[in-house]
Amino acid sequence: METARGRVLSVASECVPLLKTGGLADVVGALPGALAAEGWEMRVLMPCYRPLRWRLEQMEEVFSEEDLFGGRGRVMAGEVAGRRMLLLDAPHLYDREGGPYAGPWGDWGDNAQRFAALSWIAARIAREGLSDGWRPEVLHAHDWQAGFAPAYLAYWGSGGVRSVLTVHNIAFQGWAPAALLPSLRLPASEFHPAALEYYGGLSSLKAGLVTADHITTVSPTYACELMRPEFGMGLQGVIAARAGQVSGILNGVDTDIWSPEAEERPYTARSLKAKAENRAVLSGAFKLDVPGPLAILVSRLTYQKGIDLIPEVLPDFIAAGGGLAVLGTGDAALEGAMRELEVRFSGRVGVRIGYDEGLSHLMFAGGDAVLVPSRFEPCGLTQMYGLRYGAIPVVALTGGLADTIINANPAALTAGCATGLTFHPTEPPAFAEALRRLIHLYADHALWEKVQKNAMRHPVGWQTSAAAYAALYRELVA
């Protein structure tokens, strides 16, 4: 590994392996190791929630502030699973029963202050450095929870530190009432539409978008989509105005954890024999007997994920010989719809409501195809798992799905480069046609195996993404 050329402070609300509620944690946890290979040292700063407090005994204090939005805060440093982690210990903000963003009765009422505190400390560390002498050259903020960090650098002085904001999902914008402006240590002079003001209030995400030196999203297509009203969710004008400082960098997946070679019945692109064994085990687990392609659906069961389309397209797919195994949780109505399909198509549809990491591995190992009919998908990891395991992705043409799947049209099949099936628009007729194409492709064994092997050889690790981030950091600090 090269000697570190630069230092980056990554600021986020969650990080694997400490805490995870979604894909954000996977990305934040994977980047330090991937960037180390590119010669960059990244430390991650996140809140010390109640379930993490036991770790403080094994850490050392490297920064503090006596009045951090209502109480004392200190930054504790230590090694966690090979990562240099920084935990913001502020019990008045984070030591409480419940999740990182919400308690038993909904979102925490002081979320604006809780995550402004995270951003404030991040900006101070960037300007002043830690007591162990470490100081970053780049502050990399993730989503609304860290959106104020670039703003604090811009308004209170950056000390030469450059800032990056990554938008993982623009649907979550960190809105707060304008009355909080002074208590959040934001300048009243910047409360106008070109800066902090957002529909009469504040948005930490918008604050980051207008002040960061560079903006990234988690796929090139999503970067373009965010400048359009149907995807920008009110912020499309802000992003379009900064188009020259916006880029899309695809996420990767942990190819050590998500590896068909590491499963109980291992297989590779060179030899797919054991994939059939995994299919048999998967069929047994869901009590299925499927003559055609066995598709899987591993997803949150929500409208955004296009799950409402499944009941409309599934009958024809079942009639043509297909089957479906479902693993997920979400909207009660959609959970009910999945259960109804299981009853209606007994032996061809199996449903598990909830999430089980081990079962998800079996589903990718045994599934012939994975369905990802999302209406919008900033990046998406599910289709990458499908590629890795030779479970052919059938995806809507949006966001990161469009950037990762090579559609099995006649030209791509002739050229021998197809890796999946895409459809557009995200509506039942187009989805149903993609499933018909899946049936026909599956019937041609030689062609099907060729597409499977193409998919499994498609690079989905972090190397390419890390190289892109490293190049961006180098450009910013040059």
Swiss-Prot record:
Gene Ontology CC entries for this record: cytosol
Coiled-coil features, chain-numbered ranges: none
EC number: 2.4.1.21
Disulfide bonds: none
Catalytic activity: [(1->4)-alpha-D-glucosyl](n) + ADP-alpha-D-glucose = [(1->4)-alpha-D-glucosyl](n+1) + ADP + H(+)
One protein family per Pfam: Glyco_transf_5
Assigned keywords, A-Z: Glycogen biosynthesis, Glycosyltransferase, Transferase
GO molecular function term, any single one: alpha-1,4-glucan glucosyltransferase (ADP-glucose donor) activity
Cited NCBIfam families: glgA, PRK00654.1-2
Protein name: Glycogen synthase
